[in-house]
Amino acid sequence: MSINSNNMTDLIIAIVNDAVSDWILSYAYLLKNPIKINATHKQLNERYKFKNADNFFRSEWFKFLTDYKITYDWIANKMSICANYKYPYKAMIYFRNRIKYLLRNELL
């Protein structure tokens, strides 16, 4: 069974939806609500489902996106916007929709 372009786009979008949503919301929350310096990484993960930036940018799905020319700088910029936005969830939706647009209209 072959995968056509539309199915591949849907697969990529599903990966993006799952990975980006939780990460950006956690990242935005942490920037708005700093954690005490003595909190352990394990506590951060348990409490906020948060992965540090190094792990995030080394992740397989991130590499997959960059293979499609969605750059580190672009994603980092959108994360910064989301974190500083009054309503991070709305900003995250914009970010996710922008990736969908790129995948559907410019990349495949």
Summary of predicted features, one role per range:
Residues 2-34:
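N-terminal acidic leader/helix
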Residues 78-105:
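Charge-dense polyanion-binding interfaces
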Residues 12-13, 34, 67, 72, ...:
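Low-complexity, intrinsically disordered short peptide segments enriched in small/polar/basic residues
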Residues 7, 21, 26-27, 40, ...:
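Terminal low-complexity, poorly structured segments
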Residues 39-88:
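Acidic, low-complexity, intrinsically disordered interaction modules
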Residues 1, 104-108:
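Short intrinsically disordered terminal tails
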